[in-house]
Amino acid sequence: MKIYNVPVSIGELLDKISILEVKLMNMYGDEKIKNVENERNLLVERCDGNILEHLQEFITINKKIWDVLQQQRDKERAGELDDEFVSLSLEVYHLNDKRFAKKSQINDMYDSCIKEEKHYN
């Protein structure tokens, strides 16, 4: 099996690992779990130093995003595109801003040569 090495920022690496951890908390199916564990393990192997000590912060944010998006999906399936659905959308928006801020903080802390940028008009 071919593996591509792609440069990413340290914040992006931690974010990706944390998303895989959240998937493992919520996923079922042996094959899916095996695939997610494999990807997570490959990424964790690439982590050096003490960067993994920041992983829980990303897991906390991404778990909240997962939970809010699940609530949105449930409401959409039920045809309930109401004020609560809009509130959930705003919550995802704010959580993603928090996630970006955490990635930027980690990138600055470890002097990552790759920096994620956002631009809104």
Where are these predicted regions, by residue range?
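Extended, charge-rich alpha-helical interface modules
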Residues: 1-121
